[in-house]
């Protein structure tokens, strides 16, 4: 069994991988991961090369927050994969390392989505852990009672501490973007893009929190209600960000060192301003149809598709015109279950033959 420390260390590496521009120090982090899995001594997590100097300092001050950072990042990646299931880009990780790979070296709309949802995921997990009393430097939310909560309802339950999660996520995640050399034009533009998308993810999470109430009274009479503020689920956040991904705005760095909105390539219309919750990107997306080690795309060969579907998961789209192979597989499942007195359920095993279509 892998020690608990190694488990959350693995998850933390997912977040560091997305943030990193994949310099040599990142690969040394991967090497240390292998050492950790082998059960040998490794550097303390705050000394891992994947952390920027500023992040290492924050890590040292808030070591008990690091499991929340790692779990929040993992939850975000899982939600990313759920939102893009059946698409050519499906937020896949590299099978050999469990990491997202060099695809985030490019300033694409996929990178924009990933940065935003990772930032939201860390904020979400930190806020929840504050509520649960698992972090020493925070507790329940101290938000005031919203105007839309009736006056006769009690406000004072223990709510998710989104304010603390928001601040910690901003301090820990964004600090590496502030450490880039502002004289390097492209790096500065990418850093501004990353920070904006990080902030969009956090703002979406914060804006969609809602009061949650619990009834008190004899036999469910609900004579009294106690309410508190609760964060949206990561699935809700993922759906909102998925819509933002489709409407992401292309930008470039101008002579003043700021992000400038570009005209939409399809409509030729230029937005005069972007909302704080809009996602922005700078580069075209690569061809996700074929495996490319340089760009980090895994390709769609071997992916399961849906024959006859006109959507993204359909074989015509997902297989990129290469066609597909159909295989027959036998699946065993429980069937004809009956309750026997007393007290067990007895089932038969049935064999079901199904067909599955796999992209060439």
From Swiss-Prot:
Q: Where is the lipid attached (O-palmitoleoyl serine)?
A: 219
User: Its biological function?
Assistant: Ligand for members of the frizzled family of seven transmembrane receptors. Probable developmental protein. May be a signaling molecule which affects the development of discrete regions of tissues. Is likely to signal over only few cell diameters. Involved in the correct positioning of the developing nerve ring and in axon guidance of SIA and SIB neurons, probably by binding to tyrosine kinase receptor cam-1. In addition, regulates the positioning of some head neuronal cells, muscle arms associated with the nerve ring and the excretory pore.
List where in the cell it is found. Secreted, Extracellular space, Extracellular matrix
Name the protein family. Belongs to the Wnt family.
User: What's this protein's name?
Assistant: Protein Wnt-2
Chief location of this protein? secreted
Superkingdom of origin: Eukaryota
Organism listed in the record: Caenorhabditis elegans
